[in-house]
Structures are given as structure tokens and as C-alpha cells.
């Protein structure tokens, strides 16, 4: 849900990361609670973003909709419809990529679960007594994770 509603002004080009407000739909944070979700960007992703900005940087949303009067950004089901059209109906959804990232991140890239869960926006670490004090972001580790994840995709044939 959060992906299609990304706004260009949430991107911090100096830090090379997204700063997603806590109240953004899909983050499962209550209004007024929590911190912004920081998402480091790999060099490969940055190149894609720069190309996309050349095309639609004049719009508020990264994935703006040509039907902007009714909805300013792509419908949340657009990605799932594309996955279906690629022949993965019943086997993969946009939300299902989280399973792929968590599993592959641990098994193939050997990253700890805490790093991966923070990258995908989960807040389990904030539960319980110790969670009240846990404000770790693991940004350097997460940046390394997204760099390795991007390289894995490129090495497996993704064209950027």
C-alpha cells in the first residue's frame, strides 16, 4: 500500500533514503504515534528513481495516476494486476514479496531478521517493556542489506 502512495518530497537526496511519515497508510502506525519509516536506497534503485523523476518529477506522487481527478496515484491493485498478467496468479501478490525478501534475506544473504523486518516497516521490536526503549534503526546494516538485495536482483537478470 505504501509503495504506490510515495511522494517525491519524502525522498531525502542528501541521505539517499525515503522518509515516510508515520501516518502513511500501510505502515500500521496510529496517527500521531511512532517515527517516520526510513528506507535506505541502493545505487541501483537511485538510478531508477532518477530516471523516473525525469519522467514524472513534476507530479506530487512517484507513481502518479493519469486519472488524477479521481485518484492522485496508482490504484493499489495495479501491481497485483500486473503480477497476475505475468502469470503468477495465486502464487504471488505484491504483499507476498515481503515473504520473499524476509526468507531470501536470511537464507541467501545471511542478514539477521531484525534488520530485514525494520527495512520492510515492521515494528515488533517496539513491543513489550524493552520495546519502549528500543529506537534502533540499524541504518548502516539496512543500507548494506538493500545494496546486497539489489545486486542479487541484478545478478539474477534484472535490467536496470
Describe the residue ranges of each PLM region.
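C-terminal catalytic core of tyrosine-transesterase DNA break-rejoin enzymes
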Residues: 1-2, 74, 78, 85, ...
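Active-site-proximal structural scaffolding
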Residues: 1-4, 11-13, 32-34, 42, ...
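Generic hydrophobic alpha-helical scaffold/packing signal
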Residues: 4, 50, 80, 103-106, ...
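Conserved tyrosine-mediated DNA breakage-rejoining catalytic core shared by Y-recombinases
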Residues: 4-51, 124-126
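Catalytic-site neighborhood detector that most strongly recognizes the C-terminal catalytic loop/helix
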Residues: 20-27, 46, 110, 120-158
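Short, contiguous acidic/charged loop-to-helix segments that flank catalytic cores in large enzymes
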Residues: 23-38, 64-71, 88-96, 105-107, ...
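Active-site/catalytic core of tyrosine-dependent DNA strand-transfer enzymes
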Residues: 40-90, 100-101, 109
Amino acid at each position: 500500500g505504501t509503495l504506490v502512495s510515495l511522494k517525491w518530497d519524502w525522498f531525502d537526496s542528501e541521505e539517499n533514503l525515503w522518509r515516510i511519515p508515520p501516518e502513511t497508510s500501510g505502515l500500521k502506525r496510529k496517527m500521531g504515534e511512532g517515527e517516520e519509516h526510513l528506507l535506505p536506497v541502493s545505487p541501483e534503485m537511485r538510478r531508477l528513481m532518477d530516471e523516473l523523476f525525469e519522467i514524472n518529477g513534476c507530479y506530487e506522487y512517484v507513481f502518479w495516476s493519469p486519472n488524477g481527478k479521481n485518484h492522485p496515484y496508482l490504484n493499489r491493485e495495479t501491481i497485483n494486476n500486473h503480477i497476475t498478467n505475468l502469470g503468477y496468479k495465486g502464487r504471488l501478490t505484491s504483499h507476498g514479496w515481503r515473504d520473499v525478501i524476509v526468507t531470501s534475506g536470511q537464507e541467501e544473504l545471511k542478514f539477521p531478521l531484525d534488520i530485514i523486518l525494520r527495512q520492510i516497516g515492521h515494528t515488533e521490536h517496539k513491543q513489550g517493556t524493552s520495546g519502549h526503549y528500543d529506537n534502533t534503526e540499524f541504518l548502516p546494516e539496512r543500507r548494506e542489506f538493500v545494496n546486497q538485495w539489489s545486486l542479487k536482483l541484478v545478478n539474477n537478470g534484472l535490467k536496470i
